[in-house]
């Protein structure tokens, strides 16, 4: 993402051929993560808009273009980290905010609607990672101001 939108860039298959550049969506896009959160076969895009700014949205492909279908409603200052994957087999976006509530939260699509849950507050996540193991999943969070790395363990 950039101040001019979100672009999909593909390198050439053969050396010397042209790169392919396609504009995916407009807007000031700071960070993105993709997953098919609603299991319709098409990946949705979670964005931080603009770079380290105060909006987190989910966009869905509708009639050939990505349209905003979800906005994180909590007041945000310095949205900083996104990751997507599956948490105990369910598609998920996980996001972190560095100021105000400094929360770590996730969004899932359950029974036809987006469900948001705050995992922790006051932690200022700078980087996130999701690891799937056989009997549990791990959410890793590098919490900036606290100078700590935290592992949240999610089991059935």
Question: Where in this protein do the model-derived segments appear?
Answer:
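Beta-propeller-forming repeat regions
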Residues: 1-156
